[in-house]
């Protein structure tokens, strides 16, 4: 780690960049050039008063994005630990993921709709990681239905048995934006498990210093406001579900700290709706036996370390905006999700409450 002060662990951007190879840096530079070309056309595209100018800009944007997509596909072939949904699935699935990500990005997508598409996104990511193949052993679901005449009816459904993949998992939550996505993935694990396995939760309070730029960014891990047991993480399959992976700094900071405590994860899986390529590469270069699953890969970061084109602040869009001097704690966040979400994720809420209350 870079440093530890007053129950805080701090990692600096340079620590993360040291893991990048020359080839990584070349690819990232090439993508910066391509995206700069696209940005040069954005203002012209906005100028709807000049139809011909706007049409030419649209053509350039589409052509540039095609080039960006082709280059990122080439990069991901060289890094098998990066799993991008549209690169890993059949072509008939690509329209669905494009529409889901487009709705998440859209500035006009309101809170309820954003939550709906967030749930869809992480369900898709779960299937990408754990959905099972035709070769895997099958198990049967025998379900009692509401039809009771002339006798009580039951339905039988055959599914892949993925218990061995999911029943050693612990959800690792980077507060606060990752709370709901982690509950969604935990719920999927419970539903796919033939034993109704409910994941334990480890809760980590970490933030980056937004007064800094991307090149000198610091990631501050607050141990006093985190809830976890290192002993209960050792030998486990650690799962991180966070809406966005911009720089990878928060995730690497947490895992490196756990490793310093002697934790040896069996595996690490990271689920994201959108990742920046730089952040995704940093994660898989820095951490052994780690796989990044992302619904969409974006090409670049801006100087403030935000993903471009991105979708804004995912934490604010999922949880609402906190008052700066009075940020909500985890219990307040859970309460603000309301009865519909609380009812759906009842088992997950119980585990989270046990983690928070049992750590003090």
Swiss-Prot record:
Its pathway? Pyrimidine metabolism; UMP biosynthesis via salvage pathway; UMP from uracil: step 1/1
Pfam (any one): UPRTase
| Broad enzyme group | transferase
Record flagged with keyword Magnesium:
yes
An individual GO BP term: UMP salvage
Q: Where does uracil bind?
A: 307, 312-314
- Superkingdom: Bacteria
Q: Does the keyword Electron transport apply?
A: no
Task: Please list the GO terms describing molecular function.
Answer: GTP binding; uracil phosphoribosyltransferase activity
Please give the catalytic activity noted in the UniProt record: UMP + diphosphate = 5-phospho-alpha-D-ribose 1-diphosphate + uracil
Enzyme Commission code(s) on record: 2.4.2.9
- Which residues does the record give as 5-phospho-alpha-D-ribose 1-diphosphate binding sites? 205, 242-250, 313
Which cofactors does this protein require? Answer: Mg(2+)
Q: How is the cofactor bound?
A: Binds 1 Mg(2+) ion per subunit. The magnesium is bound as Mg-PRPP.
Q: Which UniProt keywords apply?
A: Allosteric enzyme, Glycosyltransferase, GTP-binding, Magnesium, Nucleotide-binding, Transferase
* Activity control summary: Allosterically activated by GTP.
Q: Which family does it belong to?
A: Belongs to the UPRTase family. Highly divergent.
The record describes the protein's role as: Catalyzes the conversion of uracil and 5-phospho-alpha-D-ribose 1-diphosphate (PRPP) to UMP and diphosphate.
Identification of the protein by name: Putative uracil phosphoribosyltransferase
The uppermost taxa in this organism's lineage are:
Bacteria, Pseudomonadati, Spirochaetota, Spirochaetia, Spirochaetales
Task: Point out the gene that encodes the protein.
Answer: upp
